[in-house]
Amino acid sequence: MKAAVKIGFPFTPDIEKDMKMFYESLNEKDRRHYAALEAKKLCYGGISYIAELFNCSRPTIHEGLDELKKKDS
């Protein structure tokens, strides 16, 4: 029987640090949109991961996703 392989998220600590610095340089609306885009790229678990990484709420990310959907319409 094979051991289970743990699949983690793709960001190294250095990349996470750069992402946080960039996130903190943005205004509030752009932060929502950036967090939403990063969460969307990660699919399952992405919202929770990005919310923890950027210290923002999951509803904030959902709001960003909604705003981006409205922009596409």
Label each PLM-derived region with a short phrase.
Residues 1-72:
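Double-stranded DNA-binding cores of transcription factors and transposases
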